[in-house]
Structures are given as structure tokens and as C-alpha cells.
């Protein structure tokens, strides 16, 4: 059974919250290898910053290092290298990291390049952040601000059954109303930035606050 960690928006300057650090350390401490899947496949400089850090941004590798995870081999895939990328590496790495950014671009990137078959065969620990967490669901909810027309569901990667709304703010009435208006077809979970969902087979652990909106 896959182990999945769904994150909303970790602080790029401070790293993961303590509870999330403990979860990552418990599952991944030691020397590891990682594949990072871009959610902005054409924005190479942005992708490099997300993974390796720059200026005031720690980057994924340093943030994992703060959890006592030493990344020895890093594979960042975007449109620079996807044509030459060896998909069998998905079967060998310890971590598959779905990066934050544009959920629609990431969804299309994974599907168009036939990555999902290999991801589903992999035993790697899966981490999703923001857009990456959104796409892990069977049904991915895309808010209006991502589309500039209206909110909708698209087919996700089917790695879990939790459709999340990242960066959720219960005091943002526009966001709350949008979720309420769109939870008729599928359940939705509003996940604030300091929250997470950890899935280990049939065991599900929620870290900090979350807001469940049931379909009718």
C-alpha cells in the first residue's frame, strides 16, 4: 500500500512544521533518492529554485534535510528533459515529489508523457504540495482562480480519494462559498497551509485543522 503525504503550503523560508518533520523523518530518514515532478514544466528557473533553493527559499532538498533525510540522487523532470528521462527510475527511487504550481499544467504533463503507469507501479513514498496534492486525488478540484472561468473537477491521478483545496482560509468567504457550491458531486477538504494529510494504506492521519465538505 502506498504511503502519501499531502501538504498545502509549507513555508519555503522555514521548512515544514514540526509534526510534518516527524512524519517525514519516521518514513524517510537516511540516504534517499527523489524524483520531483514540475507543475510548471516550462519554467525551468522557477523549478530549479523550488528544488535546490535560492536566496530566501530553502528548496525541497534542504527542507527534507531538515527532517534528517539526505538526498543523494535528485531527478527534476520538466520539459527540458522529459523526452530523455528514464521512466524506470520511478521504480527505483525512494520519494516521488509532486511540486506546487499550476495543477492543470502538471496534470497534463504527467498524462501526456505517460508517467502515471510507472508512478502507480512504484513503491516510493509520495509527497504532494499544493497543486501536487490536488492532483493526487481521483477527482481533482480546480478553483475558479486557476481557470479564469468557473471551478470544476478534472480527472486526477487516482492515488488517493481525498480531493483537497490547498491554502484554505476559513475566513475567506469567497473561497468558502466556492467550495460549498462545488461539493455536491464530490467531497472536498479545505486544507490550510499549516495542515497535512498522511495516508498509510487504510490509515489516515490529519495534521492540524481541516474542513470537510460532504457531497449530497
Segments (PLM) and residue ranges:
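C-terminal and late-domain segments of enzyme folds
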Residues: 1-30, 38-51, 55, 140-216
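Catalytic-core regions built around general acid/base machinery
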Residues: 23, 112-124
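Short, well-ordered alpha-helix to beta-strand connector turns
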Residues: 31, 92-93, 122-123, 160
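A residue-level signal for conserved active-site and pocket-lining positions in enzyme catalytic cores
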Residues: 34, 96, 130, 164, ...
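A glycine-rich, hydrophobic loop/mini-helix early in the fold
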Residues: 44-103
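Catalytic nucleophile loop
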Residues: 97-99, 121-139
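Glycine/threonine-rich flexible loop motifs
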Residues: 103-111
